[in-house]
C-alpha cells in the first residue's frame, strides 16, 4: 500500500487518514466500526484501480442512527430511533474537518477536488449532503444507500442536487 495511515482526533471525531504525496483528490467517508475493518482493503482497491493520487479521510461516526440522518424517524431495525444530526455532521465536515485537513496537508481542498461518499446510512447522508446549498463537494458516491429512509424519496423528488 502506498498510502500512509494515521489516526487523529479532529474536533469530536476520530479520523483515519490514508495519505500520499501530491494528492489531487480528497475522499471523505463517514464510517462505523465495521467499516474501519474494511478500510485497508478499500484503499488498496482504489490504489490498484486509479492512477490519481488521493487522500482518504474516514470519519468515525459515534452515533450512527443519530449523526447521519437528516430528520427524526422511528426505529426500523432494533429499538434505536433515528435522529436529525446530518446537519451537524455536515457542518463538522465543512467548518472543522476541511480546515484541519487544509492546514495538515498544506493543500487546497475545494469543490473541484473533494468527494463525499458512504455506505448504508452514510450513503444516505452523502446523498442528502449533495442536495444542500454551498457544499464543498465535486461529487457524491453512495453505495447501498438507505433510500428506504422515511421521507427520503419525497425529499429527493422535491429538491435539486447541488453537486456535479
Model-derived features with residue positions:
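Non-catalytic cap/lid and distal C-terminal segments of serine-dependent acyl enzymes
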Residues: 1-164
